[in-house]
């Protein structure tokens, strides 16, 4: 996600509307917005169309209407996307969706992260690690597990803007630096 200030404002506005209507609506708005944003992200031609000033707002709205119908978007999200079309912000949909997802996670008390290991962990081990991290954080954690053989062993945990590198590769790097310094 970029530092798009306008996208953050639009996401906050839609989120505020959803908050007034309850958590179920927040989730529904998130799902609908995500479906529309995913279509824009997956179709470079669609993203170019929404960015291109040569296409009129009416032409963009016509394409958007079909997209909203295919995504099964409700009235509020449809109105929101039409507002984005009027303001020339349809190309910002992926950023708006990303920030909306962050707001929704914060509302639900969910932390998202990634755990990188040198080998694929068994389901039982992944569940145990996730449970332990949730216990330590005191919050629900959604973890993506990935494998990177370059770390040699150990784990690298990325949560938000924090990284805990407990990999063998990092430890060997520290040892190498200490040897160079004569420690």
UniProtKB/Swiss-Prot annotation:
It is found in: Cell inner membrane. Keywords: ATP synthesis, Cell inner membrane, Cell membrane, CF(1), Hydrogen ion transport, Ion transport, Membrane, Transport. Gene3D superfamilies: N-terminal domain of the delta subunit of the F1F0-ATP synthase. InterPro entries: ATP_synth_OSCP/delta_N_sf, ATPase_OSCP/d_CS, ATPase_OSCP/dsu. One of its GO terms (molecular function) is proton-transporting ATP synthase activity, rotational mechanism. One of its GO terms (cellular component) is proton-transporting ATP synthase complex. It holds the Pfam family OSCP. It is a peripheral membrane protein. F-type ATPases have 2 components, F(1) - the catalytic core - and F(0) - the membrane proton channel. F(1) has five subunits: alpha(3), beta(3), gamma(1), delta(1), epsilon(1). F(0) has three main subunits: a(1), b(2) and c(10-14). The alpha and beta chains form an alternating ring which encloses part of the gamma chain. F(1) is attached to F(0) by a central stalk formed by the gamma and epsilon chains, while a peripheral stalk is formed by the delta and b chains. Belongs to the ATPase delta chain family. PANTHER family: ATP SYNTHASE DELTA CHAIN (PTHR11910). F(1)F(0) ATP synthase produces ATP from ADP in the presence of a proton or sodium gradient. F-type ATPases consist of two structural domains, F(1) containing the extramembraneous catalytic core and F(0) containing the membrane proton channel, linked together by a central stalk and a peripheral stalk. During catalysis, ATP synthesis in the catalytic domain of F(1) is coupled via a rotary mechanism of the central stalk subunits to proton translocation. This protein is part of the stalk that links CF(0) to CF(1). It either transmits conformational changes from CF(0) to CF(1) or is implicated in proton conduction. This is ATP synthase subunit delta. The lineage of its organism: Bacteria, Pseudomonadati, Thermodesulfobacteriota, Desulfovibrionia, Desulfovibrionales.
């Amino acid at each position: 996600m970029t530092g798009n200030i306008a996208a953050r404002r639009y996401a906050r506005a839609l989120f505020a509307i959803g908050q007034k209507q309850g958590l179920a609506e927040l989730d529904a708005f998130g799902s609908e917005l995500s479906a529309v944003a995913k279509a824009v992200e997956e179709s470079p031609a669609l993203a170019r169309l929404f960015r291109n000033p040569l296409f009129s707002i009416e032409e963009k709205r016509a394409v958007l209407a079909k997209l909203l119908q295919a995504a099964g978007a409700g009235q509020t999200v449809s109105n929101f996307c039409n507002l984005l079309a009027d303001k020339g912000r349809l190309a910002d949909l992926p950023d708006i969706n990303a920030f909306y997802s962050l707001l929704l996670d914060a509302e639900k008390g969910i932390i998202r992260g990634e755990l990188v290991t040198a080998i694929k962990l068994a389901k039982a081990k992944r569940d145990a690690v996730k449970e332990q991290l949730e216990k330590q954080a005191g919050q629900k954690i959604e973890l993506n597990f990935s494998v990177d053989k370059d770390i040699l062993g150990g784990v690298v945990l990325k949560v938000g803007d924090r990284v805990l590198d407990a990999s063998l590769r990092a430890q060997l790097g520290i040892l190498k630096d200490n040897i160079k310094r004569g420690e």
